[in-house]
């Protein structure tokens, strides 16, 4: 029999203090009944002797200290999971948002998940084709990896996220592929864009969407990515699917953490964020991976907007420590009309060498990638030099490198948000661009690959 408490002592913002409690545990789900019969939910955030601090999911407006009844339900916040979730849209707390019926769950799972034993982890080494050349060719995504996208306010990260969700697939695998998409603190227009894009392209059939709007309570924002990851773990490790989890925008999640931390009067850390921000983010990112003996996997692409495009801001800074690289969107490329505006030089995938090569992509992938990086870097350097000294100061070779850099941005990086390139098309395009340079400059590619692929590229020009 659940006890009912009428000892609400204080309500401050999204927090409520309940006095004289007994047998209450951390993270326990709470039901609050208002004087008018309305029911709201919360969870236990802190326990101090006979006092419990409760975090409210639906806000505190209208709560009467004397009339409110509080029940501690003896279980954490859970998500009912089933394969029927595919093709559906939910709110940030896992309730259907698309007008469809409630899901009849196979089971209910704690949204906080269970840490993966490091010894049980399998190493990520399978290529995932996103259809985006700047990622597939140069900063390869590998199954089980966590690869964030660092964006800026106003840059088209939403379009890139939708494109990857539509196009991503594991090559040479018969296993089912699913996408779990979590929109955190998004505007109504952006949420509708995602829903419409998934529906029109048919991507909704293999996807689960969790949408938390900007006007939803901050507490719901903290639960939304955990809801998405719980659904992903079920599909991956119990149904054997390859699951790609895309979470946007992690910055909104961190702002919600800061809001709750301030309401609790905690000592702030860097820029007002709680001191446990690193630990909290790791509880999200570390739920990606592969497990020995399990066919399925979870690959993560968290997307965050860097305040003032600052890479040293605590959110991108700490995210970079936990994840395995970063894809950086450039405002300069965006102004040039390069879409998607991925800046390949500061971008990095730390596991890219594990997912490429013979039997995975193509034998020449690593050499081509190294040569493209080198040539583009030299081309940018030549262009910067011409701005300072004038084009006449450049050697003939420097001019070719500058020409290569322009062609690389316009043809390789820029492909729009609807073009889906195979890895073969991406690699062949790289070879085609390298024909701009003299053969003597292609020092990072083995002779056998030059003989095999360069002549083909020259013929196709």
From Swiss-Prot:
Protein name as it appears in the record: V-type ATP synthase beta chain
Entries under HAMAP family matching the protein: ATP_synth_B_arch (MF_00310)
UniProt family annotation: Belongs to the ATPase alpha/beta chains family.
Upper taxonomic lineage: Bacteria, Bacillati, Bacillota, Clostridia, Eubacteriales
GO BP terms: proton motive force-driven plasma membrane ATP synthesis
InterPro entries registered for this protein in UniProt: ATP-synt_VA_C, ATPase_a/bsu_AS, ATPase_F1/V1/A1_a/bsu_N, ATPase_F1/V1/A1_a/bsu_nucl-bd, P-loop_NTPase, V-ATPase_su_B/beta
SUPFAM superfamilies reported in the protein's UniProt record: C-terminal domain of alpha and beta subunits of F1 ATP synthase (SSF47917), P-loop containing nucleoside triphosphate hydrolases (SSF52540)
Molecular-function GO terms, alphabetical: ATP binding; proton-transporting ATP synthase activity, rotational mechanism
CDD domains associated with the record: ATP-synt_V_A-type_beta_C, ATP-synt_V_A-type_beta_N, V_A-ATPase_B
Domain of life: Bacteria
NCBIfam families on file: PRK04196.1
């Amino acid at each position: 029999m659940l006890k009912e408490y009428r000892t609400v002592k204080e309500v401050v913002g999204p927090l409520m203090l309940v006095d004289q409690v007994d047998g209450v545990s951390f993270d326990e789900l709470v039901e609050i009944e208002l004087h008018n019969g309305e029911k709201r939910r919360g969870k236990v955030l802190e326990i101090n002797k006979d006092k419990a601090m409760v975090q409210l999911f639906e806000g505190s407006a209208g709560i009467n200290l004397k009339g409110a009844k509080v029940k501690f339900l003896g279980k954490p916040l859970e998500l009912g999971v089933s394969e029927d979730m595919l093709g559906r849209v939910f709110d940030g707390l896992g309730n259907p948002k698309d007008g469809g019926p409630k899901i009849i769950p196979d089971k209910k799972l704690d949204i906080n998940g269970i840490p993966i034993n490091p010894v049980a982890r399998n190493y990520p080494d399978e290529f995932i084709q996103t259809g985006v050349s700047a990622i597939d060719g140069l900063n390869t995504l590998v199954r089980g990896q966590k690869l964030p996208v660092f964006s800026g306010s106003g840059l088209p990260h939403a379009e890139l996220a939708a494109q990857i969700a539509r196009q991503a697939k594991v090559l040479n695998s018969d296993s089912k592929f699913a996408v779990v998409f979590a929109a955190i603190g998004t505007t109504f227009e952006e949420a509708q864009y995602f829903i419409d894009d998934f529906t029109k392209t048919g991507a909704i059939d293999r996807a689960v969407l969790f949408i938390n709007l900007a006007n939803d309570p901050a507490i719901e924002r903290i639960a939304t990515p955990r809801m998405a990851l719980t659904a992903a773990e079920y599909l991956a490790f119990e149904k054997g699917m390859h699951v790609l989890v895309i979470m946007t925008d992690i910055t909104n999640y961190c702002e919600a953490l800061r809001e709750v931390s301030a309401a609790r009067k905690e000592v702030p850390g860097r820029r007002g964020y709680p001191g446990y921000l690193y630990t909290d983010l790791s509880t999200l990112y570390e739920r990606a991976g592969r497990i020995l003996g399990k066919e399925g996997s979870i690959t993560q692409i968290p997307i965050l907007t860097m305040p003032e495009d600052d890479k040293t801001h605590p959110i991108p800074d700490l995210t970079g420590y936990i994840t395995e690289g970063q894809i950086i969107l450039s405002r300069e490329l965006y102004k040039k009309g390069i879409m998607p505006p991925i800046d390949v030089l500061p971008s990095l995938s730390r596991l890219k060498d594990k997912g490429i090569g013979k039997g995975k992509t193509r034998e020449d992938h690593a050499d081509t990638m190294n040569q493209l990086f080198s040539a583009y870097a030299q081309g940018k350097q030549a262009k910067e030099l011409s701005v300072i000294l004038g084009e006449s100061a450049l050697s003939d070779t420097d001019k070719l490198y500058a020409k290569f850099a322009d062609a690389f941005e316009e043809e390789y990086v820029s492909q729009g948000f609807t073009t889906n390139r195979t890895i073969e098309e991406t690699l062949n395009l790289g070879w085609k661009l390298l024909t701009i340079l003299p053969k003597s400059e292609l020092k990072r590619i083995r002779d056998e690959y030059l003989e095999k692929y360069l002549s083909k590229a020259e013929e196709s020009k």
